[in-house]
Regions:
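A short, charge-rich alpha-helical start-of-domain segment used by transcription regulators
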Residues: 1-29, 40, 44, 111
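Amphipathic alpha-helical segment used for protein-protein interaction
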Residues: 12, 83-116, 120-130, 140, ...
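Hydrophobic recognition helices of helix-based DNA-binding modules
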Residues: 17, 21, 39, 43, ...
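Base-recognition residues in the alpha-helical recognition helix of bacterial helix-turn-helix
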Residues: 19, 23, 37, 41, ...
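Structural recognition of an alpha-helix C-terminal capping motif at a helix-to-coil junction
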Residues: 30-37, 47-59
Length: 159
């Protein structure tokens, strides 16, 4: 298939393929792009590429739908058995929504480190390797983030 033929095929059918995939997945553009890449990678294009694309898009979109369902079930089960991070009946009166809003107010680089350490369980060395930088910089940003959160939430350190 030549580049011009592929371009015409995309111009004529990409929108309809995206609409077709949307009934099964929240990422229809990704599914269509993957199908087009499969078409390009074929040694010899199919005799009728449009029906072939619809078949590939349908299968990929349904696979994505099944994966999303499995992921949602898994995440729901994990969340049900996870310890509660915020106790609405605690003396502090701290609730998840308030804490989330305060966390959202942190600079992106600081929030990333706080979340990675507290909820991800990563060490400062691991965080440094992930975000690029030193462990001491990750630690300083973590401390700054926790200090800012305590200030916004009116929570004092028990020590």
């Amino acid at each position: 298939m030549t580049a011009d033929e592929l371009s015409r095929l995309i111009d004529r059918h990409a929108g309809a393929l995206v609409l077709y995939a949307r009934q099964w997945t929240d990422a229809p553009e990704d599914v269509v792009q993957t199908a087009l890449l499969k078409l390009v990678r074929l040694g010899r294009p199919p005799e009728n590429p449009v029906p072939w694309l619809y078949t590939v898009v349908r299968n990929a979109a349904r696979d994505a739908q099944r994966s999303a369902r499995r992921r949602t079930k898994y995440e729901t089960r994990r969340a049900e058995h996870a310890p509660n991070w915020f106790d609405p009946d605690s003396e502090t009166g701290l609730d998840g929504e308030t804490a989330t809003a305060a966390l959202d107010d942190l600079p992106d680089d600081v929030r990333e480190i706080v979340v990675a350490h507290l909820w991800g369980g990563l060490t400062f060395e691991q965080i440094a390797a992930t975000v690029g930088g030193s462990a001491s910089t990750a630690y300083r940003r973590y401390v700054a983030g926790i200090t800012a959160l305590r200030g916004k939430l009116g929570v004092t350190c028990p020590n």
